[in-house]
Amino acid sequence: MNSNLLLPDKNLRMQREQWKWTQMTLIKTHCKPGNKQCQHWRTNSQTTREGWQMLCPGKKWILNLLTRLGLNLMTTSRRDQALGMEMSLM
């Protein structure tokens, strides 16, 4: 795997003490009209599954990484499939 995908750009890195930890789980992602991406995140206190810890200030970088990895092409055609699909980043 390309190491550039694993780390944010140097100019986007924040000082270690500025990062705040929040447990989040990506529960759904789909395309809206106009090929716009829509992602639904939930804090782990709202779900029974243990999820991956992510950095709040790094959320935009993580969303961009997911887009580059192709998650923006995912679509969910039925509401019950969307509600049943819970994705935890490991």
Curated annotation (Swiss-Prot):
Transmembrane segments: none annotated. GO terms for cellular component: host cell perinuclear region of cytoplasm. It comes from the Viruses. Keywords: Host cytoplasm, Host-virus interaction, Inhibition of host innate immune response by virus, Inhibition of host RLR pathway by virus, Viral immunoevasion. It is found in: Host cytoplasm, Host perinuclear region; Host cytoplasm. One of its GO terms (biological process) is symbiont-mediated suppression of host innate immune response. Belongs to the hantavirus NS-S protein family. Expressed from the S segment by a leaky scanning mechanism. Antagonizes host type-I IFN signaling pathway. This is Non-structural protein NS-S. It comes from Puumala virus (strain Sotkamo/V-2969/81).
